[in-house]
From Swiss-Prot:
<keyword id="KW-0375">Hydrogen ion transport</keyword>
<dbReference type="GO" id="GO:0046961">
    <property type="term" value="F:proton-transporting ATPase activity, rotational mechanism"/>
</dbReference>
<keyword id="KW-0926">Vacuole</keyword>
<keyword id="KW-0813">Transport</keyword>
<dbReference type="GO" id="GO:1902600">
    <property type="term" value="P:proton transmembrane transport"/>
</dbReference>
<dbReference type="InterPro" id="IPR011987">
    <property type="entry name" value="ATPase_V1-cplx_hsu_C"/>
</dbReference>
<comment type="subunit">
    <text>V-ATPase is a heteromultimeric enzyme composed of a peripheral catalytic V1 complex (components A to H) attached to an integral membrane V0 proton pore complex (components: a, c, c', c'', d, e, f and VOA1). Interacts with YND1.</text>
</comment>
<dbReference type="GO" id="GO:0000221">
    <property type="term" value="C:vacuolar proton-transporting V-type ATPase, V1 domain"/>
</dbReference>
<protein>
    <recommendedName>
        <fullName>V-type proton ATPase subunit H</fullName>
    </recommendedName>
</protein>
<dbReference type="GO" id="GO:0061795">
    <property type="term" value="P:Golgi lumen acidification"/>
</dbReference>
<dbReference type="GO" id="GO:0016471">
    <property type="term" value="C:vacuolar proton-transporting V-type ATPase complex"/>
</dbReference>
<dbReference type="InterPro" id="IPR004908">
    <property type="entry name" value="ATPase_V1-cplx_hsu"/>
</dbReference>
<dbReference type="GO" id="GO:0000139">
    <property type="term" value="C:Golgi membrane"/>
</dbReference>
<dbReference type="InterPro" id="IPR038497">
    <property type="entry name" value="ATPase_V1-cplx_hsu_C_sf"/>
</dbReference>
<dbReference type="GO" id="GO:0000329">
    <property type="term" value="C:fungal-type vacuole membrane"/>
</dbReference>
<comment type="function">
    <text>Subunit of the V1 complex of vacuolar(H+)-ATPase (V-ATPase), a multisubunit enzyme composed of a peripheral complex (V1) that hydrolyzes ATP and a membrane integral complex (V0) that translocates protons. V-ATPase is responsible for acidifying and maintaining the pH of intracellular compartments. This subunit is essential for activity, but not assembly, of the enzyme complex. This subunit is also required for silencing the ATPase activity of V-ATPase when V1 is detached from V0.</text>
</comment>
<comment type="similarity">
    <text>Belongs to the V-ATPase H subunit family.</text>
</comment>
């Protein structure tokens, strides 16, 4: 079986390589000045002649006393790695990294190049140590080289993948979505690594370095307020490719049910927005991945999958959206089936929903608003015992949310003020119906935070804080 080739469908990346190809390096002069060793320079020169100038009869075969049919082996690659580790000439090193990329991309020489590293995996470590350095062009090309090798059978190396994820040069390029062309190359490389199940644990371990960027790319596709919105057109626009490969990377990682659960918990709002993207995109490949990610996060293998489904229903308004999608005439049979499966999952869970489920989903989202349960006295009398369960778990969660907003948030921001108002209202209801909950308020320090809000500039916050204080004091002195 031949080597796996990464097809880097990036015009920008290919243009960078084309420009490097067009610039000849004075290999002989560098050898004469002893900037490079003679063997390193002659090897690079001969390879350039064969791969770039397409002149098979040039010097490598004669200098190595080999036959005229050029073959890749240790005599070809070891001098290149040696040059990269010893030279201070950045143009030379960029050119050599590009020559290695030419070998790996070549139908004629690619298999032999990979075979050399498979027979001597230590050489991959040597190459890695001299890669991902220099300007952004060299970082991208050398990144392409090491990833092209790391995905090959016999060359899997989790430690090197972790080193790659810790490389600030590569991560900085990935995180800069203003430079979409170069960001795209890095996401493609990471996505290629994620195809290998063996690498997914270490990739997820470093998810904070790339997941926010992936969701920012997807957010730009759905946020009509952004001047930089990436419009879902019919063309193979770079923006569409960025969306697709960002989603593909997320999808590959959510095959692991633990990662799927953590993704929803850490990025709930972004997860819910996947349905928004399905609504506006006309690219079925984008829709298919969005729906597949949602299905994997709703799988019974995922811890708290029922909670995820409830969040989709209550916070993501998923059921009417999916019902609407099910009426579209998609050509992709797999997509139509996935939408049907998701619709069935949502409908089954919807039958079992209660107003308390709605309340908990809202509390979990940390985005409290004046939805019906908060102002329905019947809701509180019917469900007050739920707030006592598990050592007042839900009540403590409510107090923690209030404290987080008071101590760390912008208490004057419009949305923050609403969250504080609603949290105070709910605490009042609990205290009135469960006077013993005042002990929990005391022990958590929540009472002091409520008192502090008596001086808030917003009249509704002040009013709700006063109600809560009166409820606390009323029972304290009974």
């Amino acid at each position: 079986m031949g080597a796996t080739k990464i097809l880097m469908d990036s015009t920008h990346f290919n243009e960078i390589r084309s420009i490097i190809r067009s610039r000849s390096v004075a290999w002989d002069a560098l050898a004469r000045s002893e900037e490079l060793s003679e063997i390193d320079a002659s090897t690079a020169k001969a390879l350039e002649s064969i791969l770039v100038k397409k002149n098979i009869g040039d010097g490598l075969s004669s200098s190595n006393n080999a036959h005229s049919g050029f073959k890749v082996n240790g005599k070809t690659l070891i001098p290149l790695i040696h040059l990269l580790s010893t030279s201070d000439n950045e143009d030379c090193k960029k050119s050599v990294q590009n020559l290695i990329a030419e070998l790996l991309s070549s139908d004629k020489y690619g298999d032999d190049t990979v075979k050399f590293f498979q027979e001597d995996p230590k050489q991959l470590e040597q190459l890695f140590d001299v890669s991902l350095k220099g300007d952004f062009q060299t970082v991208l090309i050398s990144g392409f080289n090491v990833v092209s090798l790391l995905v090959q059978n016999g060359l899997h190396n989790v430690k090197l993948v972790e080193k790659l994820l810790k490389n600030n040069n590569l991560i900085n390029i990935l995180q800069n979505i203003e430079q979409m062309d170069t960001c795209y190359v890095c996401i493609r490389l990471l996505q290629e690594l994620a195809v290998i199940p063996e690498y997914r644990d270490v990739i997820w371990l470093h998810e904070k370095k790339f997941m926010p960027t992936l969701f920012k790319i997807l957010q730009r596709a759905t946020d009509s307020q952004l001047a930089t919105r990436i419009v879902a057109t019919n063309s193979n626009h770079l923006g569409i490719q960025l969306q697709y490969h960002s989603l593909l990377l997320i999808w590959l990682l959510t095959f692991n049910p633990v990662f799927a659960n953590e993704l929803v918990q850490k990025y709930l709002s972004d997860f819910l927005d996947l349905l928004k993207l399905v609504k506006i995109t006309i690219k079925e490949k984008v829709s298919r991945l969005c729906i597949s990610i949602i299905l994997q996060c709703c799988s019974t293998r995922v811890k708290q999958h029922k909670k995820v489904i409830k969040q989709l229903l209550l916070l993501g308004n998923a059921l009417p959206t999916v019902q609407s999608l099910s009426e579209r005439k998609y050509s992709d049979e797999e997509l139509r089936q996935d939408i049907s499966n998701l619709k069935e999952i949502l409908e089954n869970e919807y039958q079992e929903l209660t107003s308390f489920d709605e309340y908990v989903a809202e509390l979990d989202s940390k985005l409290l608003c004046w939805s019906p349960p908060h102002v329905d006295n019947g809701f509180w009398s019917d469900n007050i015992d739920e707030f006592k369960k598990d050592n007042y778990k839900i009540f403590r969660q409510l107090i923690e949310l209030l404290q987080a907003k008071v101590r760390n948030g912008d208490v004057n921001a419009k949305q923050e003020k609403i969250i504080i108002q609603v949290a105070l209202n709910d605490i009042t209801h609990v205290v009135e119906l469960l006077p013993e909950s005042i002990d929990v308020l005391d022990k958590t320090g929540g009472k002091a935070d409520i008192m502090e809000l008596l001086n808030h500039s917003d009249s509704r916050v002040k009013y709700e804080a006063l109600k809560a204080t009166q409820a606390i004091i009323g029972y304290t002195f009974k």
